[in-house]
Amino acid sequence: MAVEGGMKCVKFLLYVLLLAFCACAVGLIAVGVGAQLVLSQTITHGATPGSLLPVVIIAVGAFLFLVAFVGCCGTCKENYCLMITFAIFLSLIMLVEVAAAIAGYVFRDKVMSEFNKDFRQQMQNYSTDNQTALILDRMQKDFTCCGAANYTDWATIPGMTRDRVPDSCCVNVTSGCGVKFNVKDIYVEGCVEKIGLWLRKNVLVVAAAALGIAFVEVLGIVFACCLVKSIRSGYEVM
């Protein structure tokens, strides 16, 4: 009876963890989509290991949701094969997450280098490509920045002059405010450094969330193994 009661408790906790997995899966997908939206506006000339990380995060989130469904079915039916599959897949997800975290750390400088290069390339097309102009204007407004390194980068761009920057560089945006501007009326800091700082701040949040998800996954594997052992021993835990 004590063993049966303990397994009932394990089964209940596993249900709770499965709900947590679903929440984690949705969170991973949201983070991946958000990161992809940011990178899609900046890194456009070929894929790098760093720029592929959002795709990996989204894939892991979707797979985790599927694994949680398998675990729910296995727990409900007390199916040995499903629970073994659940534990194995959950372990694989942990390995992928660890690999993604390592790749993110290793290629962090590469991502910023690609961002800097592509930002400067897009600046060259500012006057001839409306879509590029819209993207750069939105970034400069959102991150209160101007140019790649600073506002003087615009002086060498075709269609610009030394006394002109895009209106999106202005603190208070009005039509033509970037022509013959006063330095005190525009953002002078570059977008590469500003966005890099924003990314570094958010990496800490993502890292903390990843640790929490990993802890939940370890508990899920442990409880799944306990239930598998119970099923194999022939205990009834309904």
From Swiss-Prot:
Annotated TM spans: 12-32, 52-72, 82-102, 204-224
Keyword Calcium: no
Gene Ontology CC entries for this record: cell surface; extracellular region; late endosome membrane; lysosomal membrane; melanosome; multivesicular body membrane; multivesicular body, internal vesicle; plasma membrane
Subcellular location: Cell membrane; Lysosome membrane; Late endosome membrane; Endosome, Multivesicular body
Principal subcellular localisation of the protein: membrane
Nucleus listed as a keyword: no
Residues carrying sugar: N125, N130, N150, N172
Membrane topology per record: Multi-pass membrane protein
Stretches assigned to the Extracellular side: 33-51, 103-203
Keywords: Cell membrane, Endosome, Glycoprotein, Lipoprotein, Lysosome, Membrane, Palmitate, Protein transport, Secreted, Transmembrane, Transmembrane helix, Transport
Cytoplasmic side stretches: 1-11, 73-81, 225-238
Motif stretch (Lysosomal targeting motif): 234-238
Superkingdom of origin organism: Eukaryota
Record note on modification: Palmitoylated at a low, basal level in unstimulated platelets. The level of palmitoylation increases when platelets are activated by thrombin (in vitro).
Quaternary data: Interacts with TIMP1 and ITGB1 and recruits TIMP1 to ITGB1. Interacts with CD9. Identified in a complex with CD9 and ITGB3. Interacts with PMEL. Interacts with KDR/VEGFR2; identified in a complex with ITGB1 and KDR/VEGFR2 and is required to recruit KDR to ITGB1 complexes. Interacts with SYT7.
Function: Functions as a cell surface receptor for TIMP1 and plays a role in the activation of cellular signaling cascades. Plays a role in the activation of ITGB1 and integrin signaling, leading to the activation of AKT, FAK/PTK2 and MAP kinases. Promotes cell survival, reorganization of the actin cytoskeleton, cell adhesion, spreading and migration, via its role in the activation of AKT and FAK/PTK2. Plays a role in VEGFA signaling via its role in regulating the internalization of KDR/VEGFR2.
Official protein name in the record: CD63 antigen
Species, as recorded: Oryctolagus cuniculus (Rabbit)
